[in-house]
């Protein structure tokens, strides 16, 4: 399994972001407070329905916005799957796999395998295992 792309809308510090991801190792780098961990959080959230930071959905949505959107394209066993997540300030999140709404997080587990590990080789490094 590998993540092919990630799109964010109104997600934390990103009004709009689209990242194409290559199979293998991908490196996120940049100055402090630029959104690297926000990208990792979005990947984890789309794959598990929960934030590894313990954040509430309304905290993830940009200030003065009512909703945020995450789209993640995943390839598994030669098939590409689209995971869409809509976060709304005063409603439950909506999640769909290939356009079909899901009711339980466990429905993602056969498609996405994702874990976050905070191995601090240096104070600012975070590892995301896919």
List each language-model region with its residue ranges:
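Cytosolic catalytic cores of cyclic-nucleotide second-messenger enzymes
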Residues: 130
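Pre-Walker A-like glycine/lysine-rich segment at the N-terminus of P-loop NTPase domains
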Residues: 1-45
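Conserved small/polar residues in nucleotide/adenosyl-binding loops
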Residues: 119-126
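Alpha-helical hydrophobic packing sites
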Residues: 12, 126-127
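Nucleotide-state sensing region of NTPase/ATPase domains
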Residues: 47-118
């Amino acid at each position: 399994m590998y993540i092919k792309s990630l799109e964010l809308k109104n997600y934390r510090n990103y009004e709009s972001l689209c990242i194409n991801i290559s199979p293998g190792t991908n490196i996120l780098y940049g100055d402090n407070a630029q959104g690297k961990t926000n990208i990792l959080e979005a990947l984890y959230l789309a794959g598990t329905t929960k934030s590894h930071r313990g954040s509430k959905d309304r905290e993830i949505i940009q200030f003065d916005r009512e909703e945020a959107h995450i789209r993640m394209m995943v390839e598994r066993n030669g098939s590409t799957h689209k995971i869409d997540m809509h976060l709304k300030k005063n409603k439950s999140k909506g999640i769909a796999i290939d356009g079909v709404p899901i009711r339980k997080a466990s429905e993602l587990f056969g498609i996405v395998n994702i874990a976050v590990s905070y191995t601090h080789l240096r104070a600012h490094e975070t590892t995301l295992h896919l």
